[in-house]
From Swiss-Prot:
Protein keywords: Cell inner membrane, Cell membrane, Membrane, Transmembrane, Transmembrane helix
Protein name (Swiss-Prot/TrEMBL): Fumarate reductase subunit D
Location(s), subcellular: Cell inner membrane
Single GO MF annotation: succinate dehydrogenase activity
Pfam families in the record: Fumarate_red_D (PF02313)
Family indicated by similarity: Belongs to the FrdD family.
Length: 119
């Protein structure tokens, strides 16, 4: 007999955030680290293209705030998802581990949203 009320899994939502964070961390984040962490301090980037005033104006725009949110939140979800599953693989069982790790990711995401909105 087929179960008429199968248990729904919430795992696809977390895997989606994990995948998005992994892609962001693999493609976008290294480019930003290269630009801001290496090229700018060495003076290899043209003039005042990324001066304080321009960066502040970008961060206060809608697209800049969205970029900051994605730059912080997606790798955060990816990292906490990896830690959650790594602990499971190592047979270290945290009581209510899903609530601990994904709850922490959700709380830190809300803190990030508050911080970026008040920027």
């Amino acid at each position: 007999m087929i179960n008429q009320a199968p248990k729904r899994s919430d795992e696809p939502v977390f895997w989606g955030l994990f995948g998005a964070g992994g892609m962001w961390g693999a493609i976008i984040a290294p480019a930003i680290v290269l630009l801001v962490g290496i090229l700018l301090p060495l003076g290899l980037f043209p003039g005042d293209a990324l001066g304080y005033d321009r960066i502040l104006a970008f961060c206060q725009s809608l697209i800049g705030r969205l970029f900051l949110l994605l730059m912080i939140i997606l790798p955060l979800w990816c990292g906490l998802h990896r830690i959650h599953h790594a602990m499971h693989d190592l047979k270290i069982h945290v009581p209510a581990g899903k609530w601990v790790f994904y709850g922490l990711a959700a709380i830190l995401s809300v803190v990030t949203v508050i911080g970026v909105v008040t920027l």
